[in-house]
Amino acid sequence: LWYRRQRQMCIRDRDDGELCIKGKHVAKGYYKAEEETKAAFDNDGWLHTGDLAEIDENGFAKIIGRKKEIIITSGGKNIAPVELENLIKTHELIGQICMVGDGKKFLSALIVLDGDGGAEKWANENGVDYNIETMSKNEKVLSAIQDHVDQSNSKVANVQQIKKFTLLSNEWTDSSGELTPSLKLKRHVVAERYENEIEAMYEEAK
């Protein structure tokens, strides 16, 4: 447990990594919403933001994910996937990624190609016919993504690394249901819709 007082604000990093804040600038609760207030504030007046954060020695908080997005491995490790997902999405080939691994020995990921120009640009520059479906099986594409995953893995702890990935042959959009209208990932939808693809990655490892 760690916290820092800064001006009229205290920020605290709980044992589970959740960012909590307290101070004169923080509301005392939700107007005429007792249950919501109880859910958001503890008995000591700390607002539980639901954000996962790392707090440095100077008291600056870096948001690394959302508590509800935590993956808990079979070894009991709590993993916030967003940091590594964001690293991997920097490659122009990649449009979306969803890390998985709840109750599993290691982390895997489902990846979809970028349909907004990035994958097409890469294909043109690398002598590959641009087609999302055929590119998902192209060895040159898979090798490029594997290299990028390896590079991204090197920037996080071993327990946070992606050991396997599956490149899907479709795009994720708000209309197809995997993304919200604001283009946020619907993890529960992905987990349900691609259950077979997810399980296949772990079957291969047995």
Which residues does each PLM region occupy?
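Single conserved hydrophobic/aromatic residue that forms the stacking wall/gate
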Residues: 1-13
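Active-site loops of AMP-binding adenylate-forming
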Residues: 5-8, 33-36, 115
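Conserved ATP-binding/catalytic segment of the ANL
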Residues: 11-13, 17-73, 90
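Adenylate-forming
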Residues: 26, 60-89, 119-139, 158-162, ...
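C-terminal boundary motif of the adenylate-forming
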Residues: 52, 57, 90-116
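Conserved C-terminal "lid"/linker of ANL adenylate-forming enzymes
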Residues: 96, 148-206
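Conserved loop-to-beta-strand segment in the C-terminal subdomain of adenylate-forming
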Residues: 102-126, 154-169
